[in-house]
């Protein structure tokens, strides 16, 4: 349901949700603000951090669904691009990615942040704007957190406006 809420706020379809679930989510979203949404969607995936060689970063990016402010996504949040790659993978694909890209856990500096989930929405390319914003809203970096919360609140406000127009 967390991915469903974030996809709906992004204006995208969430075909894995039933009609009843979609109806309930619309009700929740009417009363939601960015802080509460961040808190309620934080369990959508488990985050694991890795060190990675520079030469393997591009490969990691091709094997995941990029998120947060990775690469060109940084512009969407008015953040400076960093050399950290962040994105989503299925739990079943994690070991293969770690092996192929020689990722090491517990080694600094952190270069890769993977959000691991069993229920990754189907699709190509980057995650939805709502998911990226939620990832940033959970960041320990104050600029990223603010950018994520502001974007989530804007998406919520836009969603409310569209609901009132219908």
Listing of model-derived features with the role each one plays in the protein:
Residues 3, 7-15, 19, 23-166:
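Phosphate-handling catalytic interfaces
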């Amino acid at each position: 349901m967390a991915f469903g809420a974030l996809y709906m706020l992004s204006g995208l379809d969430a075909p894995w949700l039933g009609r009843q679930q979609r109806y309930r989510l619309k009700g929740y979203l009417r009363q939601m603000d960015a802080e509460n949404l961040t808190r309620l969607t934080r369990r959508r995936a488990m985050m694991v951090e890795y060190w990675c060689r520079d030469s393997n970063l591009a490969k990691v990016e091709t094997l995941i669904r990029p998120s947060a402010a990775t690469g060109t996504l940084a512009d969407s949040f008015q953040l400076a691009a960093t050399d950290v790659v962040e994105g989503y993978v299925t739990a079943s694909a994690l070991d293969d990615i770690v092996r192929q890209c020689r990722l090491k856990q517990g080694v600094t500096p952190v270069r890769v942040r993977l959000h691991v989930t069993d229920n990754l929405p189907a699709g190509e390319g980057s995650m939805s704007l709502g998911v990226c914003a939620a990832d940033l809203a959970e960041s320990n970096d104050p600029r990223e957190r603010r950018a994520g919360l502001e974007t989530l609140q804007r998406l919520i406000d836009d969603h409310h406006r569209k609901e009132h127009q219908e």
